[in-house]
Amino acid sequence: MSERIVIKEICEVYDGPHATPKKTVDGPVYLGIDAITDDGKINAKEFAHLSEEDYIKWTKRVTPQYGDIVFSYEATLGRYALIPKDFYGCLGRRLAIIRNVSKDIDTLWLYYYFLSPEWKQFIQSKIIKGSTVNRISVEDFPTYTVPNISIKVQCKIANILSKIDEKIALNNNINDNLLAMAYDIYMYSFYGKIPNGKLKDILVEADKSSVQVGEAKQSTGEYPFFTSGSAILKWDTPFVNGRNCFLNTGGNADVKFYVGEAAYSTDTWCISSNKNMSDYLYLLLISIKPELNQKFFQGTGLKHLQKPLLKNRHIYIPDFEKLQIFNEQVNPMFNVISENTRENQELIVLRDWLLPMLMNGQATISD
């Protein structure tokens, strides 16, 4: 794979707008860096929006199309993602588009190459240090090179890696649907009930973790490691087992749930419940998530979760019979969600192992 081709011979590269429009509740998508994950996916939950009038202005440079590769070139560097079907929106600041115009290049293969360690290492050498933020030169980007291999081999590589990603996406979709069903059951069964206790009456706190997120990023352990971010990392040893909730303690409110052995970071509060109420506790916390942000996260600058305040929140505590009926319905759902999460972690490890091997030719695909 020593032969290479210059990007400008196969692609067009477009810089995005250099300003931020007024955000709206709905309308065309304003695609910001926050909506692109570290592992190369578009997270629609992070979409912002702008008006139709501003959309016209913000797409003068380029209108994102299905199959375009979007990448970040300033501040948060090196994020790449594919523009999905039916995307209607514009690029945000510090983003650019790579548009394949060659029949000899498979766009999906090119996308995966940009996620490879080889490319990441190369881009690291091209970073321009700034007084406030670092950046990659969009002007120089078209002069960089990628491997020049046959379209047949490109398609084989892309097919294998995309099949893994499709299975991960399917599991995530199943999990989203199961969570929505469990939440509906909770709301139908308990919404509007008169409080008869406090959160601290059912709360069980796990020991505080001493492991920083940065340490876990270097780990290749087998246990899921929960943080105050969206990504689930890995750790060598579990801190807890059973049915546990993991809450952000800084920034914005978020709650995760997992069944099984797991670990967590210093900025994550791990809690469960006595009386077999952990699943109930999780859905209760999800139901008050806006309140968590507005009332229980306080402080100047970076806000932090006020645990004593939250513990004293009045809640409804169901009796044994109601809880038993509820658990019979939702426990199996969360068991499946956690099984899918475990499978996804294994698939991610497989994909990330295969990616560099396929790209540098150490692994080949037979017909």
Model regions and ranges:
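Short peripheral tails and domain-boundary helices/loops at the edges of structured domains
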Residues: G89-W109
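Short, positively charged
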Residues: L108-E139, S273-L309, S366
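Short, Lys/Arg- and Gly-enriched loop/turn segments at beta-strand edges
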Residues: L77-P84
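A short glycine-rich beta-alpha junction/loop motif
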Residues: Y73, G89-A96, I128-A158, Y264-D267, ...
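Sequence-specific dsDNA recognition surfaces
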Residues: R4-K22, D34-I69, K200-C245, G251, ...
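Non-catalytic DNA-recognition/assembly elements of restriction-modification systems
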Residues: M1-H18, T143-T227, Y316, F320-S366
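Conserved "cap/hinge" positions at secondary-structure junctions
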Residues: E74-A75, S230
